[in-house]
Structures are given as structure tokens and as C-alpha cells.
Design a protein with these regions (language model features):
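Flexible, glycine/charged-enriched surface loops at secondary-structure junctions
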Residues: 285-291, 337-342
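ATP-dependent carboxylate/phosphate-activation module, predominantly the ATP-grasp catalytic core
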Residues: 218-283, 294, 305-332, 346-350
């Protein structure tokens, strides 16, 4: 099997413009971890592998065992991607959901009839939209944070804001952990925290209304911010580990400062949630990250990321599990997920990195 790996940020997706620093750092981490996983697996299976690299990243990634295709400024990165896909059997894209980037890559692979080693374009379209994800979660009675589309919301006078407050009460979320008169606004298709804002005053709402783009608004709920690293296939989910996310709040925005992979060794309280998500989102396939916020009342689903997340970087060291090996197993059957160790691994993030 010949596999193409394309991490959008470090692989040439920004070859005609400056690399976004935060996304570049995260992309390098995930790309290196994936190449390391695949390299180990190639020692056992008959695999040949190619990777696309931005000309500014070439030499900064260990690509031993991979055919490296350098993308220069004069290249059309999408055309190069399509041409390389035609030469491969399977493709593993890593890309942000914003502007439909990941969805378009997945659709290209599917159109060319190649094996996609991630969730299909249909799953990316759904989970890449925070409001549609919220609606699907509500439809399947999975606890989530009440959300509305942000459309010219007026401070404390808008029916949608009042409806959010009422939904909090109806959902059984207690006042513990809820910031009165604080709201969180997020880009509908944004990645991480880069386009999310905490609103605390009428002036904040006025400023937010002047921004371009589509946003959702949610009550600002305080709690333990965790994530799940999972595998999914056709309505079945496998939980790999839980992760703890530590944030700083700078200029009314959350910024991920530290990530503890496999922080909670007891996975029992999350197993039913993973099974419910698998049933609610049967489109999901392969590695998926699920962002949560845990309050004294319940565990709430914040987002579903149909791609590799930063937590993936620490899984091999934390559990000895080769995620790439298990994703390849999904192509023909079920993953083994055999762990050889069980420890927490801390990843310190540079300022502005996201998950």
C-alpha cells in the first residue's frame, strides 16, 4: 500500500503566504508524530509512503523512510495534492476545518476513488460546523452546551440570549460553574481558540457585531476542560484516552498552555458517552478528538474534531499505542488498541497554539 500524508499547514497549503505561527507549530507536532507512527508500522507491513512539505519546513521534519515532495511558492498546492493522490492507494490528510479546507481535501480523495484514512467529507461538513454539531447532539440527547447563531445579539435584551439561559435550566446544568452575564462567541467553523471571544459587557457585544463571518454564542461555563482521543467506524467507538487541557485567558480569549495526555486512567465514566457519539455520528471514521467541559452536574460535549488533534502527539509515549497502526486496521476490521504502558504525558504549548 502506498500512503500519502498531507498536513495542510506544513505541507504547502500556505505556500504563497506567511505560515500562521500557531497552526504551524501544531501542524509540525502532529505531522512528526504521524510520520513516526507510520515509519514503525512500515517495518511490519508492506507500506511505501510519501509526504508533502512546505519549502520552509523541509529539513525541519524527520522524513526518513518517506518520499518527500517539496512544495515551492510557484506550485499550486491543491493541484500537486491531487496529482499525488492519483499515484497512491490511501491518503491521510490533516487540515483545519475552517473555510472548508479539510472537507475539500477529503472530497478530492473520495472523488478519485482512493482510501481515505480519516472521516469522510460528509462527517467533516457536519462536525466542522459547530451549530450543526450542537443540533445533532441535542437530537440524540447528548449533553452539550446550549448554542445559538450569533446574529446582531444585543446585550441581555435578545430573545436568543434569554433562550440560552432557559435551556441551561432545562438541561439540568446547575448555577455552579456558570459565569453570570458572560458569554462565549466562537466562529462556526473555527479551529481551537483563535477565533473565540469572551463577552462581558454591552461594548463587547457591539464590537463582536462588527466582525465578519458566522459565529455561535454560548453561555460561558466554568469547568474542567478535557478531551477524548477516540477511534470511530460505522457507529462504533473506541476510547483511547482522556486528556486534560489547561488554558490561560489573554485579552478575553482562551489560549491552550498545557495538555496532559492520558491524565485520567479510569475511562469507565466516558465509555457510554463515546458509544452515544458513535451512534449519533455514524459518519465518523478513524481518529477523532472530542472536546468536553466537565461541571459538577454533568459532562458536556463542546466540539467534535474529525481529524488528528494535538493530543495524538502524546499517545505513543503515554500508552505505547501506535494510532496509525490501529487506523490501518480499521480499513479491514477492528482496532486492537493494545497498550504497553499507562502514564500521563505533558505537552507544553507555545503561545497561541491550539488543539
Amino acid at each position: 500500500m502506498k500512503i500519502l500524508v498531507f498536513e495542510y499547514i506544513t505541507g504547502g497549503g500556505f505556500n504563497k503566504q506567511d505560515l500562521p505561527e500557531a497552526l504551524k507549530n501544531e501542524g509540525r507536532l502532529m505531522l512528526q508524530a504521524l510520520l513516526d507512527n507510520l515509519r514503525l508500522q512500515s517495518n511490519h507491513d508492506d507500506l511505501s509512503m510519501s509526504v508533502m512539505l512546505d519549502y520552509r519546513i523541509n529539513g525541519l521534519i524527520n522524513t526518513d523512510g518517506f518520499e518527500t515532495v517539496v512544495i515551492n511558492p510557484e506550485h499550486n498546492s491543491h493541484n500537486e495534492f491531487v496529482n499525488l493522490v492519483k499515484q497512491c492507494d490511501a491518503v491521510w490528510p490533516i487540515a483545519p476545518e475552517f473555510d472548508g479546507i479539510l472537507q475539500k481535501l477529503c472530497q478530492s480523495v473520495e472523488t478519485l476513488g482512493k482510501t481515505l484514512l480519516t472521516s469522510p467529507a460528509s462527517a467533516v461538513a457536519l462536525t466542522g460546523n459547530k451549530f450543526e454539531t450542537y443540533q445533532r447532539l441535542k437530537q440524540h440527547h447528548i449533553a452539550t452546551v446550549p448554542s445559538r447563531l450569533f446574529t446582531g445579539v444585543v446585550w441581555n435584551k435578545n430573545n436568543e440570549v434569554q433562550a440560552l439561559a432557559q435551556e441551561l435550566v432545562e438541561s439540568g446544568i446547575t448555577d455552579v460553574g456558570i459565569k453570570s452575564d458572560q458569554w462565549l462567541v466562537k466562529s462556526v467553523d473555527g479551529v481551537g481558540c483563535s477565533d473565540s471571544y469572551i463577552l462581558t459587557s454591552p461594548h463587547d457585544f457591539e464590537q463582536m457585531c462588527s466582525r465578519q463571518g458566522d459565529y455561535i454564542i454560548q453561555p460561558h461555563i466554568q469547568g474542567i476542560k478535557t478531551s477524548l482521543s477516540c477511534l470511530f467506524k460505522e457507529g462504533t467507538g473506541w476510547l483511547i484516552c482522556t486528556n486534560l487541557q489547561q488554558f490561560n485567558i489573554i485579552n478575553q480569549q482562551y489560549q491552550l498552555s498545557e495538555l496532559i495526555v492520558n491524565y485520567d486512567l479510569d475511562l469507565n465514566c466516558y465509555q457510554d458517552l463515546v458509544a452515544n457519539i458513535a451512534q449519533a455520528f455514524p459518519e465518523l471514521w478513524g481518529y477523532v478528538g472530542v472536546d468536553l467541559i466537565e461541571t459538577p452536574a454533568q459532562i458536556l460535549v463542546l466540539e467534535i474534531n474529525p481529524r488528528l488533534t494535538t493530543s495524538f502527539v502524546g499517545i505513543k509515549a503515554a500508552l505505547g499505542i501506535n494510532v496509525a497502526e490501529n487506523v490501518l486496521q480499521l480499513v479491514k476490521g477492528e482496532p486492537t488498541l493494545t497498550s504497553f504502558c499507562n502514564q500521563a504525558i505533558t505537552i507544553h504549548m507555545k503561545q497561541n497554539d491550539s488543539n
